[in-house]
C-alpha cells in the first residue's frame, strides 16, 4: 500500500489503521468507526467491487484523498457471507477503548479473522453441509492431509499414498479452505480449488506440530489417538491447528481429540466414482436427484451432515454395520413419535462450537435450552425400544437437568439477537440487575416513599416529588409555603406559583437512574459471560450428547426411509460376491412416472464378470449404477432397494462411466477414459466392485475393441474383481466361451418397424443386436439419414459379418502397429457417385482407376 510509505504524515487515526493493516496485508480489514465498519485505500476499492457498494472518499491524509467504503455494523453478517462465498477472508477490528477517556484515537484491535474454513456464525454456514478447513503436505513418501470442522470440533488426518488417493480425498471432503506449503509440488492437484492459502514451510514442521497438538489436548504424546506414527498427517494437522488458533484469537476447547482415517477402515471411492454415482451432487453440480436427496429426510441439520459423511465414507467393519441394521429394524415402529421431538433439538452441535469459541448468541442459548427440554421425552420414548444400541445412544445423550434449569432461570423466553441489545437475562435471576432495571424503568416506589416522608417531616401539605427532562428530579413546594422549606433544600427552579428544590438524597437517586441503563447492560453482559463459564465445564458431555442425537436422527431417518420406500435388510457374507433379487435404482425409481423394472444380479467367485449388452437407452448404465448404490447403501448400514440382497466384502468401488473432455487439463475424452481405466487396472483387487461402461468408444473401432477385450481379460483373469462390463462391441460376448467366471447378460428391447420399446429387463445371454438405428430414429434423426444408414449397414454386414470378431479372436491388435494402407483406387471409388456421371466422365474414371491399381 503506497500510503504506508509516508507514514508520519498521516493523521493519528490513519496511522493506527495502517499499523493494523500491515499485520494483515493480504486480507480485507473491517475497521470499526462508530456504527460502521470502514475500509480504506485498496481494501475499499476491492470491497466496492466484491460487495457492489459505493466507493467514496474520507477526507485526506498525508495530502492525499482516502478511498473509503463502509457497511453498517448491524448488517455485517450479510456482507461477510458474500465475501466468504467468494473465498475472501476478513479481519474484524473493533473498538476496545472508551472514547470518553481516550486521548487520541480510540484503542482498537483485530478480535477475529473470518475465513471460509473457520466460520462458525450461523448466518455464514450452510446448515446441512460440513464446512471444512484442510491442510495438505507432501514429501517423497506421499501426502499428509488434515481436516477440521471448527463448527463441531471434528479433527481428522490421513496419509494418502499416491496422487489418485489424494485427489479422491479432496473430492470427498471438499474443503472450504485449503492450506498448502509454499514449496508444494503437485499444484495441478489443487489448482482451481476455492480458498487456497499458501503457508510458510516452518508451519508444517513435525516437532512444532507434535508440540501444538499435545498442548491442545493436554497430553504428553499422541499415542492414545493412534496418530503417533503418521508424520505426514501430523505436519498437515499442526499447520491447520495453528491457523485455526491465529484466526479465532481464542482457545479452542471443543477440539479435544484427533482421529486417524485409514484406507482399510472404509470402502475407497476415487473422485470419478463419487462424481459418477451422484452421491450428494449430481453431474450438473446440483443436489437434485442424488442418492442423498432420496435418503436424507433427517430432521436436524447435524443429522443431515452426519448422513452425508456416512455416504461418502462407507465402513467395512461388519460389526458396526450389523449394529446399525439392528437399530434401524428396532426403530421402524417408532419413527412417527421420535421425529417430531428430534426436530425440536435443532443444531446443538454447532451451538456448542460457538459456546466453546465464546461467540454463542442469546438465541443460541435459548435453542440449547429448548434442546435440553426435549431430552426427557426422547429418553422416555427410547426406553421402550428393545435394542442394546438404542439404549447405548439413550445413555450418551444424557439429561442435563441442572443446565436446563440454569438456562430456564437465566434467559428470557424470546431473547434478542445480540446481548448488546439488552433484555437477555430473565427477571429474578440476579437481584442487582433487577434493581438497576427497576431504576432505569422508573418502576420503584422510592419517589412515593420520599414524598410521604418529606411531607410528614416538614408538615408542608403542598410538597410533592416530580421529574422533568430538563431539570431532572425535584421536590416542589407552593410559593405560599416556600418560605418554610428546610435549610437542606437547594433551589433548582423557580416557577410562577411554586419553587422546586433538590436534596442530596434525591440527587444521589437521580445519578443512579441516569447511569442505571448503562450499568444494567454492563451487568447483563457480565452475567452472560458467566453463563459460558458455567456451561463450558460440561462441554465434553454436551458434545457426546449432540453426537448421539445426530446419530439417532440418522438411524430414525433410515428406518423411516426403509419402511416408506420398501427397502430390505441386506445380509453380509464372507466370500466375495453380490446376489441381488429384484434390485432397484434408489433414485431413478423415485423420479419415474411408471413402475421401475426391478432386476436380479449374481456375482460370485465363479461368476466374477458380467458382459452387459443391449440397446442404448436400454438401461445398462442404470443397472450398473444401481448395483454400486445398493452396495454403498449396504455398507453404511442402511436397508436397500431390493427384495433380497447378499453381499460379500468390498474394499473399493470403481466406475468408468461416461466421460467428457477435461479442457482445463488439456485432456481429450479418450484420454480421460484411459486415465480412469489405468487407475482401475492398477488398484482394483478381487474384493473390488468395478463398473466399466463402453470402454474404447473414443478411438477407432479396432483400437477400441482391442482395448476393451484386453481390459476385460485383465479384470477377469488377473485381478478377479467383481465386474459389470457394459459394451457395444458384440465381439466381447465371446469372452464367456474363452474364460471362466464370465457370463453374458443383456437388456431386452422389442423393435417394430421404425419404433422400439425398451423392456429394461435383464436377461441371461447376449443381445441379438444393438438397435442403434432404432434409437437414432427415436431421437429424431431425419428419415433419409436413417434410410441411408440401414443401406450402409446391410453393405457392411454382407462384406464381412465377422471381421472384427475374427481379428480379436486371433492375436490381440497392437495400438502401435501400422494399419494396412488403403488402396488409392478404393478411396477414389468410395467418393464416386456413378449416377451423376456422363458417359464421357465414366470413361475418364475407368482410365484413372486403371492408373491407380
UniProtKB/Swiss-Prot annotation:
A GO MF label: damaged DNA binding
Keyword DNA repair: yes
Superkingdom classification of source: Bacteria
InterPro entries (UniProt xref): DNA_mismatch_repair_MutS, DNA_mismatch_repair_MutS-lik_N, DNA_mismatch_repair_MutS/MSH, DNA_mismatch_repair_MutS_C, DNA_mismatch_repair_MutS_clamp, DNA_mismatch_repair_MutS_core, DNA_mismatch_repair_MutS_N, DNA_mismatch_repair_MutS_sf
SMART domains assigned: MUTSac, MUTSd
Record-listed ATP binding positions: 614-621
Any single GO CC term annotated in Swiss-Prot or TrEMBL for this entry: cytosol
PANTHER family the record matches: DNA MISMATCH REPAIR PROTEIN MSH1, MITOCHONDRIAL, DNA MISMATCH REPAIR PROTEIN MUTS FAMILY MEMBER
Pfam family, one: MutS_III
GO biological process: mismatch repair
Protein's gene: mutS
Keyword entries, A-Z: ATP-binding, DNA damage, DNA repair, DNA-binding, Nucleotide-binding
Record's keyword annotation contains Ubl conjugation: no
Function: This protein is involved in the repair of mismatches in DNA. It is possible that it carries out the mismatch recognition step. This protein has a weak ATPase activity.
Name of the protein: DNA mismatch repair protein MutS
Entries under SUPFAM superfamilies matching the protein: DNA repair protein MutS, domain I, DNA repair protein MutS, domain II, DNA repair protein MutS, domain III, P-loop containing nucleoside triphosphate hydrolases
Family from the record: Belongs to the DNA mismatch repair MutS family.
Amino acid at each position: 500500500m503506497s500510503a504506508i510509505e509516508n507514514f508520519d504524515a498521516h493523521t493519528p487515526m490513519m496511522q493506527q489503521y495502517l499499523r493494523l493493516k500491515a499485520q494483515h496485508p493480504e486480507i480485507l480489514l473491517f475497521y470499526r468507526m462508530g456504527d460502521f465498519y470502514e475500509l480504506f485505500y485498496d481494501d475499499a476499492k476491492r470491497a466496492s467491487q466484491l460487495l457492489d457498494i459505493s466507493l467514496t472518499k474520507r477526507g485526506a491524509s498525508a495530502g492525499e484523498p482516502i478511498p473509503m467504503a463502509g457497511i453498517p455494523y448491524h448488517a455485517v453478517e450479510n456482507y461477510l457471507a458474500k465475501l466468504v462465498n467468494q473465498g475472501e477472508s476478513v479481519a474484524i477490528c473493533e473498538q476496545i477503548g472508551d472514547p470518553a477517556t481516550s486521548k487520541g484515537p480510540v484503542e482498537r484491535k483485530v478480535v477475529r479473522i473470518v475465513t471460509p474454513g473457520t466460520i462458525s456464525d450461523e448466518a455464514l454456514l450452510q446448515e446441512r453441509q460440513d464446512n471444512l478447513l484442510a491442510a495438505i503436505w507432501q514429501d517423497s513418501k506421499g501426502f499428509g492431509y488434515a481436516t477440521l470442522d471448527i463448527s463441531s470440533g471434528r479433527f481428522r488426518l490421513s496419509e494418502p499414498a499416491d496422487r489418485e488417493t489424494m485427489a479422491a480425498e479432496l473430492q470427498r471432503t471438499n474443503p472450504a479452505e485449503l492450506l498448502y506449503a509454499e514449496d508444494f509440488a503437485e499444484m495441478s492437484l489443487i489448482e482451481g480449488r476455492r480458498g487456497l492459502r499458501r503457508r510458510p514451510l516452518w508451519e508444517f514442521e513435525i516437532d512444532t506440530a507434535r508440540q501444538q497438538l499435545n498442548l491442545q489436548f493436554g497430553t504428553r504424546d499422541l499415542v492414545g489417538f493412534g496418530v503417533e506414527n503418521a508424520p505426514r498427517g501430523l505436519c498437515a494437522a499442526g499447520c491447520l491447528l495453528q491457523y485455526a488458533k491465529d484466526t479465532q484469537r481464542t482457545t479452542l476447547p471443543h477440539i479435544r481429540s484427533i482421529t486417524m482415517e485409514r484406507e482399510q477402515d472404509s470402502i475407497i471411492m476415487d473422485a470419478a466414482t463419487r462424481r459418477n454415482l451422484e452421491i450428494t451432487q449430481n453431474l450438473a453440480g446440483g443436489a437434485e436427484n442424488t442418492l442423498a436427496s432420496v435418503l436424507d429426510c433427517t430432521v436436524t441439520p447435524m443429522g443431515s451432515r452426519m448422513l452425508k459423511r456416512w455416504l461418502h465414507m462407507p465402513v467395512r467393519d461388519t460389526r458396526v454395520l450389523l449394529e446399525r441394521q439392528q437399530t434401524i429394524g428396532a426403530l421402524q415402529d417408532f419413527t412417527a413419535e421420535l421425529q417430531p421431538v428430534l426436530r425440536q433439538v435443532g443444531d446443538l452441535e454447532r451451538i456448542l462450537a460457538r459456546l466453546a469459541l465464546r461467540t454463542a448468541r442469546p438465541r443460541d442459548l435459548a435453542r440449547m435450552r429448548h434442546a435440553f427440554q426435549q431430552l426427557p421425552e426422547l429418553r422416555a420414548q427410547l426406553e421402550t425400544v428393545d435394542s442394546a444400541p438404542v439404549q447405548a445412544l439413550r445413555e450418551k445423550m444424557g439429561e442435563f437437568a441442572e443446565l436446563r434449569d440454569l438456562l430456564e432461570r437465566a434467559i428470557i423466553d424470546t431473547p434478542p439477537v445480540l446481548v448488546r441489545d439488552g433484555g437477555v437475562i430473565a427477571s429474578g435471576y440476579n437481584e442487582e440487575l433487577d434493581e438497576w432495571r427497576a431504576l432505569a424503568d422508573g418502576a420503584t416506589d422510592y419517589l412515593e416513599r420520599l414524598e410521604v416522608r418529606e411531607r410528614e417531616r416538614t408538615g408542608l401539605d403542598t410538597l410533592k416529588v416530580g421529574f422533568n427532562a430538563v431539570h431532572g428530579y425535584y421536590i416542589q413546594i407552593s410559593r405560599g409555603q416556600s418560605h418554610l422549606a428546610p435549610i437542606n433544600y437547594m433551589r433548582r427552579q423557580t416557577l410562577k406559583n411554586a419553587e422546586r428544590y433538590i436534596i442530596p438524597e434525591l440527587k444521589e437517586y437521580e445519578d443512579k437512574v441516569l447511569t442505571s441503563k448503562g450499568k444494567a447492560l454492563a451487568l447483563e453482559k457480565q452475567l452472560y459471560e458467566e453463563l459460558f463459564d458455567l456451561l463450558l465445564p460440561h462441554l465434553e458431555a454436551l458434545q457426546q450428547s449432540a453426537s448421539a442425537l445426530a446419530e439417532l436422527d440418522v438411524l430414525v431417518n433410515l428406518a423411516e426411509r426403509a419402511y416408506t420406500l420398501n427397502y430390505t435388510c441386506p445380509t453380509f457374507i464372507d466370500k466375495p460376491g453380490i446376489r441381488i433379487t429384484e434390485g432397484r435404482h434408489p433414485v431413478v425409481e423415485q423420479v419415474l412416472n411408471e413402475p421401475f423394472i426391478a432386476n436380479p444380479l449374481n456375482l460370485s467367485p465363479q461368476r466374477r464378470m458380467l458382459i452387459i449388452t443391449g440397446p442404448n437407452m436400454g438401461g445398462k448404465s442404470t443397472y450398473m449404477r444401481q448395483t454400486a448404490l445398493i452396495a454403498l447403501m449396504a455398507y453404511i448400514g442402511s436397508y436397500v432397494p431390493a427384495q433380497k440382497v447378499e453381499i460379500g466384502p468390498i474394499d473399493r468401488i470403481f466406475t468408468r462411466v461416461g466421460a467428457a473432455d477435461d479442457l482445463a487439463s488439456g485432456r481429450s475424452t479418450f484420454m480421460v477414459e484411459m486415465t480412469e481405466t489405468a487407475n482401475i487396472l492398477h488398484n482394483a483387487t478381487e474384493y473390488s466392485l468395478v463398473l466399466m461402461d463402453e470402454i474404447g468408444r473414443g478411438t477407432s473401432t479396432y483400437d477400441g475393441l482391442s482395448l476393451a477385450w484386453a481390459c476385460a481379460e485383465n479384470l477377469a483373469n488377473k485381478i478377479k474383481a467383481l465386474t459389470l462390463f457394459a459394451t457395444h462391441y458384440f465381439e466381447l460376448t465371446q469372452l464367456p466361451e474363452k474364460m471362466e467366471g464370465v457370463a453374458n447378460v443383456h437388456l431386452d428391447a422389442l423393435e417394430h418397424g421404425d419404433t422400439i420399446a425398451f423392456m429394461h429387463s435383464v436377461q441371461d445371454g447376449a443381445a441379438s443386436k444393438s438397435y442403434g438405428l432404432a434409437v437414432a430414429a427415436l431421437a429424431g434423426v431425419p428419415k433419409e439419414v436413417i434410410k441411408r444408414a440401414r443401406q450402409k449397414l446391410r453393405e457392411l454386414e454382407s462384406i464381412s459379418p465377422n471381421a472384427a470378431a475374427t481379428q480379436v479372436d486371433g492375436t490381440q491388435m497392437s495400438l502401435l502397429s501400422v494399419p494396412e494402407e488403403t488402396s488409392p483406387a478404393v478411396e477414389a471409388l468410395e467418393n464416386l457417385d456413378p449416377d451423376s456421371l456422363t458417359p464421357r466422365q465414366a470413361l475418364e474414371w475407368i482410365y484413372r482407376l486403371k492408373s491407380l491399381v
